[in-house]
């Protein structure tokens, strides 16, 4: 590691949010803060919720909420203006936070505004979730080919071994040196010398995210975002100075009474307690009631945005100290399981209404992109397809389940009834409008059938002379649930199978297998990952396919790698099994050198 500044040919552009920092610093800070970070604008009118600030202090100091909150005459929300924003990073953990200066809204003070028309240079960036091999003792970081081409300085490919030195600055202003080379079999982009020092100094672990940003002038920035389980607290020095010296309530009360500025610390992963005035009004006007369906955004492990669905089951005050407060006033119930803890009470501005046509959510963990028939319910696949025009759908109009009927599936028929959101993983379909040319085509077909009696006409495999009877999937589900209820009354044991299991049984034979190539073997093999439960079974299956008998388990002679859509090589076993199944395109077995 080196400390210093990179010399640019042009003066560094100041940030738009934090003018004391550079534009590149600001872009890196936002990427490290995550996709859900919502920083207000300079001069913007906002609502400040003391309850949210106290909640952040509670999480940081592990104090009880009630012990921190005295009883005083302070509104549940304060209307303020944003005076200044300073984007910061914690020295030890590299966690991002912001110091936001607020002032109770007044027209007597000149408020600085954010320059939205400022020139914004082109910035390329990429993020990657670190695997076990990325932080291993060999000190090598594999850069996906697409990201290396777009975000790293170009290599001189005319050289026998293309390589270059990279200088990257982190959020602290420290400069790091990495050796970037293009080598291996097959060749790939690697960061070698300097990478091990970086991972050791930053105490990186598997699951952390590395962030690279490159500006138009070639300046390179590097940052990290800790995995969710690695998230620590705001440093005690910051909390004690900015929040705890006079107390959150005391400082807010003093500013409110005397119309003076006060500073709050905002952490990107905390709930938003500084809310835009317009955003707050939109949320309140949405009229969230008991029974309303909603969706809420969360951050995935790879810095991606994920949505989860739920239902509002109650409206009440989160704390007895503030009556009629909107902070976490909605009690919710989630539809699906998540690998992390989600709140059971949320604020109106954190969620979005689900439109009636979207009341049947697509499961966030349902990754299958190929839609399949579910004949278990006695319906054609057209009932379960999303609102996309399919072949043959223009001929006539199919009967589909209305959103009103589908929404009834969320009510449990009996105590032991399954959650129908899991029973029927389908998409709501709006009826296709009838068109004039549909009637003309059907009339033409009917005339042909009349003139040529005895001939069985088929259109897309469907007999036009004797149209099939299409059963309503909703009625069939109701019948199955009724049978289940009756069976339990008489002590019988009946089980409704979920469509996921039905699909896997019906279509396992048609799934695309993954090709496996072994060094020294001309003809490759194919393995079906859908029937395997993990890496141990995969290794056993590969040993059977190539008659290796235990040689792959020790990995002394062979190594197993795979390539994804970007053709980059990665070791098998570094990623969680479900992620591996989604990424893998081809598997290779190579001899160790």
Swiss-Prot record:
PANTHER family: AUXIN RESPONSE FACTOR 12-RELATED, AUXIN RESPONSE FACTOR 4-RELATED
Name of this chain's protein: Putative auxin response factor 15
Sequence ranges assigned to domain PB1 in this UniProt record: 511-592
Organism from which the protein derives: Arabidopsis thaliana (Mouse-ear cress)
Record carries keyword Transcription regulation: yes
SMART domains in the record: B3 (SM01019)
A Pfam family that the UniProt record links to this protein: B3
Function: Auxin response factors (ARFs) are transcriptional factors that bind specifically to the DNA sequence 5'-TGTCTC-3' found in the auxin-responsive promoter elements (AuxREs). Could act as transcriptional activator or repressor. Formation of heterodimers with Aux/IAA proteins may alter their ability to modulate early auxin response genes expression.
One of the protein's GO biological processes: regulation of DNA-templated transcription
A GO cellular component entry from the record: nucleus
């Amino acid at each position: 590691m080196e400390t210093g500044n990179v010399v640019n040919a042009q003066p560094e552009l100041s940030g738009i949010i934090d003018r004391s920092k550079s534009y590149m610093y600001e872009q890196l800070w936002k990427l490290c803060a995550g996709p859900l970070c919502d920083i207000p604008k300079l001069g913007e009118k906002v609502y400040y919720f003391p309850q949210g600030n106290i909640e952040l202090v509670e999480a940081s100091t592990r104090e009880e909420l009630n012990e921190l909150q005295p009883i005083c005459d302070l509104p549940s929300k304060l209307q303020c203006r944003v005076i200044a924003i300073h984007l910061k990073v914690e020295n030890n953990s590299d966690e991002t936070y912001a110091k936001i200066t607020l002032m109770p809204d007044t027209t007597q003070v000149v408020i600085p505004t954010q320059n939205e028309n400022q020139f914004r240079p082109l910035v390329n960036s990429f993020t990657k979730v670190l695997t076990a091999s990325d932080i291993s003792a060999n000190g090598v970081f594999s850069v996906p080919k697409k990201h290396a081409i777009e975000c790293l300085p170009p290599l001189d490919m005319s050289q026998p071994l293309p390589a270059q030195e990279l200088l990257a600055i982190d959020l602290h202003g420290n400069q790091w040196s990495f050796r970037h080379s293009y080598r291996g079999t097959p060749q790939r982009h690697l960061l070698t010398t300097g990478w091990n020092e970086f991972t050791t100094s930053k105490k990186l672990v598997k699951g952390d995210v590395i962030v690279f940003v490159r500006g138009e002038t070639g300046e390179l920035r590097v940052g990290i975002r800790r995995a969710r389980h690695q998230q620590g607290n705001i440093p005690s020095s910051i909390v004690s100075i900015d929040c705890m010296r006079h107390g959150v309530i005391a400082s807010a009360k003093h500013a409110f009474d005397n119309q003076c500025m006060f500073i709050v610390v905002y952490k990107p992963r905390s709930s938003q307690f500084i809310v835009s005035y317009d955003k707050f009004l939109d949320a309140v006007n949405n009229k969230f009631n008991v029974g309303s369906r909603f969706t809420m955004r969360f951050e995935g492990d790879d810095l991606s945005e994920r949505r989860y669905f739920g239902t509002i089951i109650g409206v009440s005050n989160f704390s007895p100290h503030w009556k009629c407060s909107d902070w976490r006033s909605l009690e919710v119930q989630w539809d699906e399981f998540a690998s992390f803890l989600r709140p059971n009470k949320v604020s109106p501005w954190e969620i979005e209404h689900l439109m009636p046509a979207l009341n049947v959510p697509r499961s966030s963990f349902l990754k299958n992109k190929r839609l399949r028939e579910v004949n278990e319910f006695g319906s054609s696949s057209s009932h379960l397809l999303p609102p996309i025009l399919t072949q043959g759908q223009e001929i006539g109009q199919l009967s589909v389940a209305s959103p009103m009927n589908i929404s009834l599936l969320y009510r449990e028929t009996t105590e032991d009834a399954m959650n129908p959101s899991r029973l029927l993983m389908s998409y709501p379909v709006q009826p296709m409008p009838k068109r004039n040319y549909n009637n003309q085509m059907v009339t033409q077909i009917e005339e042909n059938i009349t003139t040529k009696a005895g001939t069985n006409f088929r259109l897309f495999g469907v007999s036009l002379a004797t149209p099939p009877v299409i059963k309503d999937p909703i009625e069939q589900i109701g019948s199955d649930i009724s049978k289940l209820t009756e069976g339990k009354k008489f002590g019988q044991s009946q089980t409704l199978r979920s469509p996921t299991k039905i699909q896997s049984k019906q279509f396992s034979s048609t799934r695309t297998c993954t090709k496996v190539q072994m060094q020294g073997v001309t003809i490759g093999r194919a393995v079906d990952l859908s029937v395997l439960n993990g890496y141990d079974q995969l290794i056993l299956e590969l040993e059977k396919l190539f008659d290796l008998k235990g040689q792959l388990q020790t990995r002394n002679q062979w190594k197993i790698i795979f390539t994804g859509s970007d053709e980059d090589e990665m070791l098998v076993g570094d990623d969680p099994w479900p992620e591996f199944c989604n990424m893998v395109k081809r598997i290779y077995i190579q001899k160790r050198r």
